[in-house]
C-alpha cells in the first residue's frame, strides 16, 4: 500500500505539517499503515513552510511531488535528508 497525501507545509524544521489538528491523527494512521512509500503532494507555496501541527517528521516522507516553482534551496535540503523530489512542469501537460 502506498499513501498519497497533501499538507499545509513541508520543511526540514517541522516535517509534514497541517493547519487542522484533527488531520494529524488521520495522517499518522495513514502513514503507519503504508507498506510501501508515502508520497506527499505540495505545490510551491507549501515548500519550506511550517504550519501549526506536525503530522510526520521529514524522515517519514520518501517522495515529494511538487511544481516547477518550488524553491530549489529547500528542495536540495529535503533531497539531502533522503526525500526523492518529483517536479512537475507546466509543459508536461501541454500538447
Give the ranges of each region predicted by the language model.
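Conserved phosphate- and dinucleotide-binding cores of soluble alpha/beta proteins
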Residues: 1-95
Amino acid at each position: 500500500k502506498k499513501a498519497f497525501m497533501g499538507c499545509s507545509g513541508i520543511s526540514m524544521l517541522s516535517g509534514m505539517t497541517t493547519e487542522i489538528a484533527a488531520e494529524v491523527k488521520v495522517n499518522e494512521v495513514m502513514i503507519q499503515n503504508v507498506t510501501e512509500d508515502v508520497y506527499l503532494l505540495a505545490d510551491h507555496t507549501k515548500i519550506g513552510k511550517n504550519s501549526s501541527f506536525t503530522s510526520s517528521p521529514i524522515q517519514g516522507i520518501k517522495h515529494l511531488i511538487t511544481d516547477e516553482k518550488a524553491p530549489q534551496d529547500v528542495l536540495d535540503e529535503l533531497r539531502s535528508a533522503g526525500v526523492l523530489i518529483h517536479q512537475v512542469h507546466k509543459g508536461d501537460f501541454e500538447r
